[in-house]
Swiss-Prot record:
NDH is composed of at least 16 different subunits, 5 of which are encoded in the nucleus. It catalyses: a plastoquinone + NADH + (n+1) H(+)(in) = a plastoquinol + NAD(+) + n H(+)(out); a plastoquinone + NADPH + (n+1) H(+)(in) = a plastoquinol + NADP(+) + n H(+)(out). The keyword Transferase does not apply. The keyword Thylakoid applies. It comes from Tecoma stans. It is found in: Plastid, Chloroplast thylakoid membrane. Signal peptide: none annotated. This is NAD(P)H-quinone oxidoreductase subunit 5, chloroplastic. One of its GO terms (biological process) is electron transport coupled proton transport. It is an enzyme of class 7 (translocase). NDH shuttles electrons from NAD(P)H:plastoquinone, via FMN and iron-sulfur (Fe-S) centers, to quinones in the photosynthetic chain and possibly in a chloroplast respiratory chain. The immediate electron acceptor for the enzyme in this species is believed to be plastoquinone. Couples the redox reaction to proton translocation, and thus conserves the redox energy in a proton gradient.
Length: 750
């Protein structure tokens, strides 16, 4: 066991050869490197698999022995200062390593097919491997300086991957937005690190915790300053994990490739903020008010993320706001001191969300053959529907991920979310009520995404499905199918021309076969020519096995990973693997783990939470289940759309709520006006001051010198009498000024 821990330092460096060799190969042997590009995908997966075996071994040993291992190298610069760096292997490290490796391997396998026709294939895998290296370095760091270094590297890799298609203005803007937003949090993190070093004189976690606890017990610290430093540390996690108010970068980050979204949202960048708070929870517990701040920010994010997901039409943006809300649950759990519940939900959410994002990538992949390669079309749920019979494997896996995130037993997220809800009730009934209500919203918006995507018929050209020629067309409302508003047949929202198909990578348009279009006019699909093969497609198709295999593996994780945290420790049985795994950290936090759980209490709480989830599912099914497939009688629909003052007020409320949700609660425009506009105004004022005042003074001195020199030049024509006249004039002026000052000093003594 000791040897395994001693060689754990190699974990961050194992994926590193891939980006280095790809870079060298593209510089020295570009043609051969590009021809053998599939080899680099295999190498990336192989090296990450080795790390997974290593991490699995460490995890098993920690479960059996409940041990923590730390190794530190010290570089003494002088007698008063030494630089220490090393690695720390504890339960939190092993959990994060398992998440990064398992999710990362699935994403790499998936990406081999998803990115197969992309010109940036090699660049993609180089970024991914370096991303893994940075994240492994972060989770194995033993001090705050190493944390900050790898924290910045994780952010850099995220920016590179968000802006992977940097030639597209939306991707470039999203990359810039993520960078600027995270700069705010990272600056706070740096100030917090320096503040605690000034207080304790150490960056090492163990020394820092011990010294700080001694200072607190002896009442030798300034509480407001300590609280400020802790809040600055937490600001780094707020930005990285997309918590309110620094959450605005996360939805725009969907401009990157879908596999990147899966990795960022499941196990890397956004998980880094949760990791940081969990790592420093020993410090935060003894600081006044900081846990209250953490729990409040988490609760606001839980509710805000859920409400903003209600009206999104982009499938990836809807999942992004779902991630924001679920991360809020984890921050809330850490803020109320529920360390085990937070990490449990981090594990279960990672696999469920990776499954959902990879499933959405499969859906987008199939829709591109129908609507083209523009993300505004291929990711638009309004244009989807009826994909169940065409992508059944993707549909089933996406449904399981949706059920898990909705909190339906026995899937993974049910166990962890239910534990957070129960712990929040013990902390604050108000917090618990909001958290429970948001659980219902989660089930609602997740099934809204599922129903709009897979149920009904394909909506991309608003086909009349009733069979009659003169039947009214009903709009596919983002609020459900009960809307009775007629749509204009010339409706232009995200619709392609009748005879064109667009490509994501090219500005060219390709004409469809008119004869084939006339032949298939009765089918509920449109025909376009595929970008690469120029082959016409009239229906979506299931993804290749390379993309389906990771989905099936993640389905298994979603089904069974929740079993590691089942809190049933009865006589003769011990099913709570997670508590044994986290025992050293729980002991360090001086928390008592539950020896047993009452079946009656557990079932009572579970029934309540599941009932709320089912209510959200029922409401989503009622609003979004296609009217032409389930409610043949349109009079039943008309029963709910009766006009009148109550209906008018209800529609007005829904419109306001929809606008608020779809426009991201107007937070982005507020930031644009208050911060971006203010900074640009200040920049323009600075520019004006620099050009008119600073440059004016400098240029004015030069111009005055020029005219003075010219005047002197014309005054001195080479005649001695002119020189004498000019000289006596200057002397006279000087004497007059001197005489005036002399008289002034006589009459007004100082």
């Amino acid at each position: 066991m000791e040897q395994t821990y001693q060689y754990a330092w190699i974990i961050p460096f194992l994926p590193l050869p891939v980006p280095m060799l790809i870079g060298v190969g593209l510089l020295l042997f570009p043609t051969a490197t590009k021809n053998l590009r599939r080899m680099w995908a295999f190498t990336s997966i192989l090296l990450l698999s080795i790390v997974m075996i290593f991490a699995t071994n460490l995890s098993i040993q920690q479960i059996n022995t409940s041990s923590i291992y730390q190794y530190v190298w010290s570089w003494t610069l002088d007698n008063d200062f030494s630089l220490e760096f090393g690695y720390l292997i504890d339960p939190l490290t092993s959990i994060m390593s398992m998440l990064i490796t398992t999710v990362g391997i699935m994403v790499l396998i998936y990406s081999d097919n998803y990115m197969a026709h992309d010109q940036g294939y090699l660049r993609f895998f180089a970024y991914m491997s370096f991303f893994s290296t940075s994240m492994f370095g972060l989770v194995t760091s033993s001090n705050l300086i190493q944390i900050y270094i790898f924290w910045e590297l994780v952010g850099m890799c995220s920016y590179l991957l968000i802006g992977f298609w940097f030639t597209r203005p939306p991707a470039a803007n999203a990359c810039q937005k993520a960078f600027v937003t995270n700069r705010v949090g990272d600056f706070g993190l740096l100030l917090g690190i320096l503040g605690f070093y000034w207080i304790t004189g150490s960056f090492e976690f163990r020394d820092l915790f011990q010294i700080f606890n001694n200072l607190i017990s002896n009442n030798e610290v300034n509480s407001p300053f300590v609280t400020l430093c802790a809040a600055l540390l937490f600001a780094g996690a707020v930005a990285k994990s997309a918590q309110f108010p620094l959450h605005i970068w996360l939805p725009d980050a969907m401009e990157g490739p879908t596999p990147i979204s899966a990795l960022i949202h499941a196990a890397t960048m956004v998980a880094a903020g949760i990791f940081l708070v969990a790592r420093l929870l020993t410090l935060f517990i003894v600081i006044p008010y900081i846990l209250n701040i953490i729990s409040l920010i988490g609760l606001i994010t839980v509710l805000l993320g859920a409400t903003l997901a209600l009206a999104q039409k982009d499938i990836k943006r809807g999942l992004a706001y779902s991630t924001m809300s679920q991360l809020g649950y984890m921050i809330l759990a850490l803020g109320i001191g529920s360390y085990r519940s937070a990490l449990f939900h981090l594990i279960t959410h990672a696999y469920s969300k990776a499954l959902l994002f990879l499933g959405s990538g499969s859906v987008i992949h199939s829709m591109e053959t129908i609507v083209g390669y523009s993300p505004d079309k291929s990711q638009n749920m309004v244009l989807m529907g009826g994909l169940t019979k065409h992508v059944p494997i993707t549909k089933t896996s996406f449904l399981l991920g949706t059920l898990s995130l909705s909190g339906i037993p026995p899937l993974a997220c049910f166990w962890s979310k239910d534990e957070i809800l129960n712990d929040s009730w013990l902390y604050s009934p108000i917090f618990a009520i909001i958290a429970w209500a948001t659980a219902g919203l989660t089930a609602f918006y997740m099934f809204r995404i599922y129903l709009l995507t897979f149920e009904g018929h394909l909506n991309c050209h608003f086909q009349n499905y009733s069979g009659s020629q003169n039947t009214s067309l009903y709009s596919i409302s983002l609020w459900g199918s009960t809307c009775s508003q007629r749509i204009n047949k010339n409706f232009h929202l995200l619709r392609m021309n009748n005879n064109e198909s667009s490509s994501f990578f090219s500005k060219k348009t390709y004409r469809s076969d008119q004869t084939l279009r006339k032949t298939n006019r009765g089918r509920p699909f449109i025909n376009i020519v595929h970008f690469d093969t120029k082959k016409p497609f009239s229906y979506p198709y299931e993804s290749d096995n390379t993309m389906l295999f990771p989905l099936l593996v993640l389905v298994l994780f979603t089904l069974f990973v929740g079993s590691i945290g089942i809190p049933f420790n009865q006589e003769g049985t011990d099913l709570d693997i997670l508590s044994k795994w986290l025992a050293p950290s729980i002991n360090l936090l001086h928390q008592k783990s539950k020896d047993s759980t009452d079946w009656y209490e557990f079932l009572k709480d579970a029934i309540f939470s599941v009932s709320i989830a089912y209510f959200g599912i029922f409401l989503a099914s009622f609003l979004y289940k296609p009217i032409y497939s389930s409610l043949k009688n349109f009079d039943f629909i008309n029963f709910f759309v009766k006009t009148g003052p109550k209906r008018y007020r209800w529609d007005k409320i829904l419109t306001v709520l929809y606008d608020w949700s779809y426009n991201r609660a107007y937070i982005d425009p507020f930031y644009t006006t208050c911060f971006t506009g203010a900074i640009r105004g200040l920049a323009q004022l600075t520019y004006f001051f620099d050009r008119r005042v600073i440059d004016g003074i400098t240029n004015g001195v030069g111009i005055m010198s020029f005219f003075l020199g010219e005047g002197i030049k014309y005054a001195s024509g080479g005649r001695i009498s002119s020189y004498l006249f000019f000289y006596f004039c200057c002397v006279s002026i000087f004497l007059v000024i001197y005489y005036k000052f002399y008289l002034f000093s006589l009459y007004i003594p100082f």
